[in-house]
Every structure is written in structure tokens, then in C-alpha cells.
Amino acid sequence: MVAERTFLAIKPDGVQRGLVGEILSRFERKGFKLIALKQLIPSRALAEQHYGVHRERPFFKGLVDFITSGPVIAMIWEGEGVILGARKLIGSTKPLDADPGTIRGDLAIDIGRNVIHGSDGPETASFEIGLWFESSELSDWNPSDQLWRVE
């Protein structure tokens, strides 16, 4: 059985501010498994597909401009309950509403510069994983401490 997977992306503000290591470590400490990671500057076409659900909203162009403005760290994480678990680690979309201890609660203050993106459900995760990664880019491996993380 394949464990649940989710797509996460550290946005250009998180990369530029040197937050990549801290953000990665939060997911590792939680016990989720990183199965794919790459750094890229997304093309406009990729960004427009990724944010396609917002195409008719007034902030769409700004969102696409921002996500294509610099490097992004695109990742796939795997584990039991990883989609909901990642959303809880990330915190509210609006950083000022995010709880202390969450990534956005601790590291962001503006909704337009909220450091990280995370898939909001299984269908979205599947779509985003397929959009950002080829299947050949995923690593299937078992951490040596796996028996100590889940029953």
C-alpha cells in the first residue's frame, strides 16, 4: 500500500530569506518522508496551471508574477495523514491568523508573502504532484527508523 503523499513548495520569499533548512526540518522532525525535491524558477505556464483555480480572481496575475519571480523548492512528502499534518504544520493562509508554532505563524506576516504552499486535499495533491514532477523523479526508500515512528 502506498502511503499518502502531498505536494509542498517553499515560495520565493522563503528561499530568498534562507528559510529552506528550517522548513524542511519541521517536516522531517514530524516523521514525514521526503521522496522528491528540486529547486526551479517556475515558468509562467507552470504557475498558471498550478494556480488555475484562481484564474478569474483579481489577485491571479500578482500570484503568478510572484511565484515566477525567483527560485522555488518543490517537494513531495509521504506519510500517514501527511496532507492534513502538513496543513497543520503550515498554518493559516493568512499569516497573522496562523497559530504560533506553525510555519506561517512563526515566519510570515503577509498573505502575499506567506513562505510556503501545501496541497489542500488528496485530489489537489495528486494534480500538483503530476504537474511539478515526473514519476522518475520520485525516490522510493524506507527510513531506518520507520518502525519507531508508526505502529
Swiss-Prot record:
- Lineage of origin: Bacteria, Bacillati, Cyanobacteriota, Cyanophyceae, Synechococcales
Biological process annotations from GO:
CTP biosynthetic process; GTP biosynthetic process; UTP biosynthetic process
- The active site consists of H117 (pros-phosphohistidine intermediate)
**Assembly notes:** Homotetramer.
**Where does this polypeptide localize?**
Cytoplasm
- Which key words are in the record? ATP-binding, Cytoplasm, Kinase, Magnesium, Metal-binding, Nucleotide metabolism, Nucleotide-binding, Phosphoprotein, Transferase
Query: E.C. number, please?
Result: 2.7.4.6
Q: Report the coiled-coil segments.
A: none
Please give the Pfam families that the UniProt record associates with this protein: NDK (PF00334)
Q: Which CDD domains match?
A: NDPk_I
List the Gene Ontology MF annotations in alphabetical order: ATP binding; metal ion binding; nucleoside diphosphate kinase activity
Listed name of the protein = Nucleoside diphosphate kinase
| Cofactor(s) for this UniProt protein | Mg(2+)
Q: What does this protein do?
A: Major role in the synthesis of nucleoside triphosphates other than ATP. The ATP gamma phosphate is transferred to the NDP beta phosphate via a ping-pong mechanism, using a phosphorylated active-site intermediate.
InterPro entries to which the protein is assigned, alphabetical: NDK-like_dom (IPR034907), NDK-like_dom_sf (IPR036850), Nucleoside_diP_kinase (IPR001564), Nucleoside_diP_kinase_AS (IPR023005)
Q: Where does the secretion signal sit in this chain? A: none
